[in-house]
Amino acid sequence: MTGLRTDKALRDDRIAVDAPLTWVAKSSSKFIAANERVLFFLFLFTLPFVNPWVRGDGVGYYAYLRSTLIDHDLRFEKDYLSANESFVISRADPQGHLLPRMYTKTGYVDNHFSVGPAILWAPVMLAVHGSVLLADRFGSHVAANGYSYPYLLAMALTTACYSFLALFLSIRIAQKYFEAPLTLLATVGIWMASSLPVYTYFNPSWSHALSAFTVALFLWYWERTRLHRTTGQWAILGLVAGLMGNVYYPNVILLIFPALEGVHLLFPRQRDGDPLVVSIQKSALNCGVFVATFFASLIPTFITRWIIYGSPFETGYPAISTWNWTSPVLLKILFSADHGMFSWTPVLILAVVGLPILVKTDTLLGVGSVLTFLAFYYFIASYPDWAGISSFGNRFFVSLTPIFILGLAALLSSFAKWLGRTTRAVAIACPVLALLILWNVGFIFQWGTHMVPARGEISWSRMIHNQFVEVPLRVTHDCETYFTRRGEMMLHIEQEDIDHQEIHGDREN
């Protein structure tokens, strides 16, 4: 019937937007399983670096889970007053009471951090809470208060697992378009040479690694079902999109992908004199289902905003009208000594350069990735606290980890074609990425031990001196301390943070 797209037409249309070529998938199939095993074993090797603590922004994210699970309310006084001292000193008076400014008009404690991380942690934490209560009956006497070690360890390991899933789903997407060795290099390169390790291992209670997972899940499902998605699959995509927004509000920018797909389906290319069109009624139904499930999935955010702020649409962040929309810091956000994305994590330069190449590989995926990055870039550059206050690199862009992996894989693939052999490209790319990873690990070490300030601009001359002189001298001793006397080390780092705040008047987010 006129206006209805057949299955064959859908398959043809997928080819028309440069779907992954069959020869790529076949030539890489024997390496894909090996890729995923390597990624998994690398992940297992890094697990001892997981740091089970709740600190800074993580206090707000974790409070939703702990307060709901243990106290059965959204009263966060206990969470805030029990937090790390550098978090408390700017929020409480000398008598140990939260300052009046910490309360909203509804009488609840201001908690502008998103509820999404608590949703992702909840299944594991419910099991842990039940286990702690059960163990208590047998005389274990572990405090079932959400602060004891089993809870913190479970939270940290859960975050690490979600971070790994972000990488796993990202490499699954990339392997459809590029040769397996190149996708493994791209994935490991972005994983280890970006800001992701800080929010996977050192600060697992923050939202960024979890955000990367939800973006990867959304992109993976969108790519897997695009152009032939059923109404039910549109509903699932809407739910995943809502989860993505619950975890990190700017992630809704990723809706660019289904929007582009919708435009393509409504205005497809004409073939053999027979234009392929989609029923307007069918498109409207799918769009309605997607929007409905998207907003339904956001209900946890709407409810918590309503309770805390009195409106489901109040976020607690600076009003959009106060943002720097007409004067975004487009260069500073990339190159500033104050957590510039490219200056702190230069591997992302390669990833962004690869995004236009991705357009040539697959139009929808490539254009969606480019537009998403540009929109995200402008959005964060317009945000008053664009540098992230306390941040390694520009932490806001950790959400785009899957897109960066695709961009780097596209660049490596183009390089391999230029050289004429994949093995040559791998041989050259491996040492380059290894150097970027070593540089990043040394930089993270400096940042974590406060050899460079966690807030504000750093001195590049001092940082470079540290990389070549101080880091090699200290790394063995400090790593030993991290694994054998971690609590003592964290207290020392916390005290340094307090001293820095008192001197410079800095604040937590």
Regions found by a protein language model. Give the residues of each.
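Transmembrane alpha-helix segments characteristic
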Residues: 35-42, 185-191, 239, 289, ...
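Membrane-lumen/periplasm interface segments of specific transmembrane helices
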Residues: 257, 264, 268, 284-356, ...
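Specific aromatic-rich, kink-prone transmembrane helix
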Residues: 169, 189, 210-241, 257-258, ...
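Membrane-embedded, lumen/periplasm-facing catalytic core of multi-pass transferases
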Residues: 390-391, 429-509
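Aromatic- and kink-enriched transmembrane "portal" helix at the membrane-lumen/periplasm boundary
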Residues: 140-166, 181, 187-217, 221, ...
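Membrane-interface alpha helices of multi-pass inner-membrane proteins
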Residues: 44-45, 65, 186-188, 232-248, ...
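Start-transfer (signal-anchor) and selected internal transmembrane alpha helices
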Residues: 1-49, 53, 155, 165, ...
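Transmembrane-helix signature of polytopic, membrane-embedded enzymes
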Residues: 32-39, 133-145, 165-194, 213, ...
